[in-house]
Every structure is written in C-alpha cells, then in structure tokens.
Amino acid sequence: MAANPNETTQTDAPNLSAVADVLDKDSQETREWMDALSAVIESEGPERAHFLLEQLLEHARQKSIDMPFSANTGYVNTIEADQQERCPGNIQIEKRLRSYMRWNAMAMVVKANRLHPADGGDLGGHIGSFASLASLFGAGFNHFWHAESENHGGDCLYIQGHSSPGIYARAYLEGRLTEEQLLNFRQEVGGKGLSSYPHPKLMPEFWQFSTVSMGLGPLMAIYQARFLKYLHARGIANTENRKVWVFCGDGEMDEVESLGAIGLAARENLDNLVFVINCNLQRLDGPVRGNGKIIQELESEFRGSGWNVIKLLWGSSWDSLLARDKEGILRKIMMDTNDGDYQSFKANDGAYVRKNFFGRDPRTLEMVAKMSDDDIWNLRRGGHDSEKVYAAFHSAVNHKGQPSVLLIKTVKGFGMGKIGEGKNNVHQTKKLGDEDIKLFRDRFNIPIPDSQLADIPFYKPADDTPEMKYLHERRKALGGYLPERRTKADESFTVPSLETFKAVLEPTAEGREISTTQAYVRFLTQLLRDQALGPRVVPILVDEARTFGMEGLFRQIGIYNPAGQQYTPVDKDQVMYYKEDKKGQILQEGINEAGGMCSWIAAATSYSTNNRIMIPFYVYYSMFGFQRFGDLAWAAGDMLARGFLLGGTSGRTTLNGEGLQHEDGHSHIMASTIPNCVSYDPTFAHEVGVILHHGLKRMVEKQENVYFYITLLNENYAMPGLKAGTEEQIIKGMYLCKEGSKLTPRVQLLGSGTILRESIAAQELLEKEWGVAANVWSCPSFNELARDGQNTERWNLLHPAEAPRLSFVGEQLEKHTGPVVASTDYMKAFAEQIRSFIPKGRTYKVLGTDGFGRSDFRSKLREHFEVNRHYIVVAALKALSEEGAIPVAKVADVSLVKD
C-alpha cells in the first residue's frame, strides 16, 4: 500500500514517547524502535517506512496478535507546514475582497430583517455560515473552480445552503446581481428578489443544484460525480477534467443521507469528487459533539470507507508553536480538548484561552509566556488561513484514485464579535445593532464613514481598482463566472413517430395476455434501438430487473461498472446473463432507492449540467418511491429535472401476498404535490405507449421542464389496442374507452389502473342484471384532470365578465347523462380531486383503497377494500336512487355493505 504523501512525518517529530502509555515496561526498547523508524524515514523515505509498518502488522496478525485498528491521525493538519503548496494569488487583495463580501452578505441579511410588514414577521437569513466559509469560497473561486468554457465542461458546485448570502455578495461585486436584487433578498414575489437558498426553479440561470433540505447535497453530489464518469466511459461527453465540489456542515453530516453513499464513491474511485466539510463545531442549537470531536469522528468514517482525508485544523500562526512542541505536549492537549471547550475558547478571549487551554500543562503555558492575550486570541483555525486553505484544495484536486474529503476547522460567525462569534445562537442571529455593525466594519476595514453606517450601505469598489480587476481576472482565467446554470441544451433531437412503437399500441393476439410493465419494457427496447436516442437512454434499476422482466437488457446493453467484469458470472451460459461492462448503459444501484433517485436526478438534469440530453428511466416498487425518497423528488422538481419515474407493482390490491409495506395506494397523491411532476396511472398497453411517447416529445424534443411518473402493473390481461383519435384525451387524462348501450337509466363509470377493469366488469353486470346502461371512462390521470380543473376555475375567477370555461372533465361528461362513479386502486382522495368539476346536479361517488394494505389474493383484497365490480354496482345503483332514477328498495336488494 503506497504511502499518502500528505501524511509524511518530519525527522524532527515530537518525542511521542513522552506522552506514551504509562504502562510501557521497557522504554529503552520503545525508544530503539522509534529511532529505527525515524532512521528509515530519513534515509529511505516515508514510502519505505509505510511498507515496513504494513509488513510488521501483517506478521503480527499471522501470529494471532489482536491488532486494534484506528482510522484516526493526530489532531493536527494533514499537510505539514514545509510541504504545503504555495498560493500563487495576491493574498492581500483576496483578503480585501473577502472583507467586502462579508460586509455585503451581512448587510443583505440585516437590511432584510429591518423591514416591518403590516402582517409582522421577519424574512430570516443567516450571517454566521458564510462568515465561517468565506476563506474556503475565496480559494475556490479565485484558483480552482472552472466555469463551463470551450475547453472545460465546468465544475459542479454544491453550495452549503445557509451560506447563500455570501454567494450573492460575490455575484454583486462581479456585476452579475444588482443592488436592487440584494435589497430584495428573500422577497421573490415581485420578480426582482433572491431566493433564500440555492433553488434552480427560482433562479434558473444562477443556481445549478438544490442543496436544501440538508443531507441531500452530499448524496446527490456523489451520484453526480459517478454520472460524469459514466458519461465519459460511454463516450457521450469528455468529463475527465471536471470536479464535483460539495460544501456541507459538520452538523449536516448527521443526516443519514450525508454519509449514506460514501462507500460507493470510494468503491468507484471517484477522484473527481471533493467534499469540503465546514467544521465550525456548531449546529443550530449547540455543539455538534460537545463531549467529543466531530472532526476525528468524520475522519474515521471517511478514511475507513476508503477516502483520501485531508484535515486542516490550525492556521499558520500555530506553526511555530507546533515546531517547538518536541515532547508532543501541545499535540496531546489539542487531542484531549473536546469540541465543547473549543467552542468556548472562541466565545471568550485570549486570557480565557491562555488559562483553560495552554494552562493545562506548565510546559505549554511556558510556550506562550511571551505572547500577549491578543496574540493568543489571534491563533486562528485553519479554515481562516487562505494560504493553508489553498494548499488543502491543491492537494485534493491533484489526488488520484480516491475521492477526497477536506475536514476544515472554522469558527461559526467569524468576525461577528460578541454578538455571534462562537455563540450557540449565532445561526439565528440576523439582526445587528449599530455598535455591532460599527465593530464589524472596523474589523474588516470597510471604507464606509460613520455618517452612513445607519443605512448599512452595500460596498462595491470602482471598476478600475486593483481589487475589481483582480476579481474579474481570476474568473476569466477559470473560464467565467459561477454559479451559472444552463437552461437548455445546445443539441436537439426529433422523437420518432408514435407508429414506431406499434408493438405496444396494437391489440394483443387472441389468447395472449401481458401486463403494462411488459408494455413498458417493449417500448424501452424499441427506443434503445433508435440510433439517435438509444444511446441517451439511462435505465436505472434498484435490484428489481427480474421483478419487472427487464433482465433481457443485461446482455443487450450491459450494466455499467468502471472495473468491468473481473469474474465469470454464474449464468454466463445463458442468453440473458448478468453482464457488467466498463461501457455498460444500465445503472444498477442495488437495494438503494435513494441512490437510484440520485442517479436519476443526475441524468435528468444532464441537459443543464453537461449540455447533453439524457433520458433516464428509473423503475422501482411504487411503494418505495415518493414515500421513501420524497425529499429528493421535490428537489428534482426544484432542479427542473426531465425524465421518467416508473412505479412498478402499483396499486393497493395488485401485488399478491406482499402486504402492508408493499401495497401502494397513495403514490399518485404524493406525486400530485410536485407541480412539475406529470403523473399517470394507465390500464392498457396503448396508454403506456402514448404517455411515454408524449413524455419524450415534451422533455426531449421541446425541452420542457417537467418529469413524468407512470405507475405500472404486474397483472396480465388482454390489451384492446389504441383507438384512433383518443391520443390527446389519454394525455389530458380521460377518454371514453367502452360505451354502453342506449338503455336508461344511465351511469358513467370512471376508473384507472387495474380497477378500470372492475368498472368494465361492473358495466356488464349493471346492464344484464339491473337494466342500467353504463359508459366506462378510462382516466389515466386524475392528477392532470384536477390540475386542468383548477386552472379552469382560476381563469373563470379572474375573468368574471367573460363566458366561463369548462374543465376537461366537464367537457367529457356534459353530453353523457347520469351519476358518476369513480373507482381506483388508490385512496379515495385521488379521485376526489375532480369532484368540483363534475357537471352540476350530478351525483359523484368515489371508491378507493383507504387504509393499510395486507396480504392475500387480488380478488379478496378488492373485496376487502370495496373496490371490486360488485361494490361499483352498489355505488352506481345508490347514486341512481339518490337522483330518483330507481327506487331505494332496488339498491337494498343488492347492497353488500358490511356491519
């Protein structure tokens, strides 16, 4: 195992034996071993020393000696002072620019919270987060982060959400944002404001990635980095010089999503990925690990998972003290001090630090005897030393073969003084008094006179000043300004005609039955054959290909694996063997719905991130979709994703035997909450084909910012085929699929998914046994019908003097008499959405599958949830009796209602 060049040990290392285990029974022998190791390092280098230590450890294991493992290193910087890369920038100019940005970020938040609307309340905002991050952002923007240009695809920046004021402050200096926009921070309704956090939906030409709610940024970024490798491996885009940078807080790492995929990043050698964890030791309420050390904890998590870990804890002002620490006493105190105390040090003063930190040992107290309290106070953490930050970033971007994580220690609220610096309430601090503002100005040398301070004016140097010239020169050298988002891809595609997919549009052969899942697979297979669009298809699986009958794709297009297939698959002699390939097209995520969704988001936003239109198809158990990764689905809407989500084995009664946790009766209700998610619950193969084709037209050909959710069934039955002229009605959400006789009385039966077939069966029962005619309407999208109705009602509300418009539901039903009964395999709320759009005076009954699912056969489940053909008949007759079309006694004769 090669040595990590960032962890070399100097020959004048401290005498660690002085603070070694007091149980050392032979200190002379220990010293001889230590001296021998030092000699090897000096004469043959750290790599040889590393090799010898590995051999010794292995030998000890072979002798059955229990060897405790620790993924931790000392509580010091990974990069020694004499090994750090020198920053090529103008340190003084960069410091002044950071000061201006700190001021403008603070002013933006404070100004916003001085507004006093009549309805009360504050706009909020955060000063402390950017205050701790300013030096980190400065290094990145000035020296590392490439914008998209002719020779570079652009780096991807996942910005810590609460630090957004600092990003706006930089963009203001760059001339990309106006003072008016800064004055309208968090005031967006008028169209001239800035969003609270990174939201591409709200600022589509600025923010690339949505990073709140917390935890989503780290997870999505890992799969983004992996997707860049995927694109490169498949020859779709050259991404080899691009990096994915992720900024997150140490408190944010408690979100399970934050660390949930770090193993994948190491397993796939994502050396294009850099995590920067802002370790200011604080979260909103208090310390992240008051009694412990969050940096050491995170180091072990990441190093144990196979990451390159770079710790930056101490600024340059500590270097001379550490160099004098020959006995390792200072290092031991650094390690023994817990995070709660470190926070207290920064919330107090130099005298407090002298007594409570250096005063823990007379030898360290002597070290600082000639230093004033101010000198001690100015011993800064590493994240506020721009030269050390540069060195850490430089090391990370030049590391090969592993993802890198930088654990950088900072102070939350740095520069805010007594009102916020290191205080528990700093996250909530958004109002500063006049004296606090004056101290802030003085600390950062902002050239604003006392006479103007009350207004907290923004500060922007003249364009011809050295600072402004430097600001623009650095971004020019890196290809342009960031963050910046592409709204459309430069490339364009024409979707093949609907006729191309006739295999799913035509009726099934006599005696042949298929499921809508099979219809989807047929459509996908045909699309993969298209020379233009086929290579852009990204099938995403979560260990369910065989469940959905998709294993035939394994050999056809292969499963992406950057290592290829280094084993002989057990089914190699079969036609559909499990084929992994460096250029494979399928993304197989394993049992990992959240990971699958992140891969889908990366592909679904590729038009923007990579200027390459990709077409992701992510299929999964519908119950484990929105319910499991709902926050990511919302983020996908925010990021204007385009692609297909396919909920398999959908419906509460369709999945035999699986029970409560598997049977989905509400995914469409959850999908309806996302404004740009277009959802369908088709019954027939031709509906699946029409909907998928329409989705391709909207998202690929027209580049509309929507994504589709389509539920699929595993129930086999004959398919009737597409009736010409119904395509548009299918897309709108409702069409007459089986007209009844001319008898009276009449009812209208609505349904979707598998329960539509129960409505068709009920139609026959009503006519044969009760003399009631029924039209059967397929409603592939109650959600789209509801949205159309709501839009219609809004138009009518805002245009009272004009003739009212009719909703699509109203248009379809107004010419067909009788009460209306809607039945679905989902909760009643699903079909209840259209109640107000049913023509006036008509009775509307809804049957649904409210309650927990359970295991049994389909017929028994449908009887249990009261959605089978017999209950539809009862509902129809009851509705007719309520309208006076039949006597109530007739309903009583057939009622199946249980006590």
Where on the chain are the PLM-derived regions?
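Residue-level marker for buried hydrophobic side chains located in beta-strands
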Residues: 246-247, 275, 540, 646, ...
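A structural-propensity feature for long, helix-poor, extended segments
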Residues: 246-247, 253, 631-652, 657
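Glycine- and acidic
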Residues: 19, 36-39, 86-94, 113-125, ...
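Cofactor-binding active-site loop characterized by glycine-rich and histidine/acidic residues
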Residues: 89, 93-101, 105-118, 126-268, ...
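Non-catalytic terminal/interface segments that mediate subunit docking, oligomerization
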Residues: 84-105, 109, 116, 130, ...
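Short alpha-helical segments and helix-capping/turn motifs at coil-helix boundaries
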Residues: 119-123, 135-145, 150-154, 205-209, ...
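N-terminal amphipathic, basic-rich helices that act as targeting or association modules
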Residues: 2-174, 440, 514-530, 534, ...
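Thiamine diphosphate
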Residues: 4-5, 27, 188-210, 216, ...
